[in-house]
Amino acid sequence: MADSLSDRIQKFILENYLFTSDTRALGLDDSLLGRGIVDSTGMLEIIMFIEEQLGVTVKDEEMIPENLDSVSRIAAFVESKRKVA
């Protein structure tokens, strides 16, 4: 079965920031900034992942924690952008 959008996002963050494949290390609603998983540079890398791997353009005004601070928020943001496109 194909990975869900949330699975793909979680896998990217686990492998690139927590250096593990253990999904227990990152809950879907865990704050990426609050837990210190990513900093501003890491957030830019996540935005590049969203644009390059998920095919969604992130505008400057959309680069806010409400859209990007957890796996579930990123997935919801990407889904909302895909519906508009």
Regions found by a protein language model. Give the residues of each.
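Phosphopantetheine-dependent thiolation modules in NRPS/PKS and related acyl-activating systems
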Residues: 2-39, 47, 52-53, 57-85
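Two-component histidine kinase catalytic core, primarily the HATPase_c
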Residues: 42
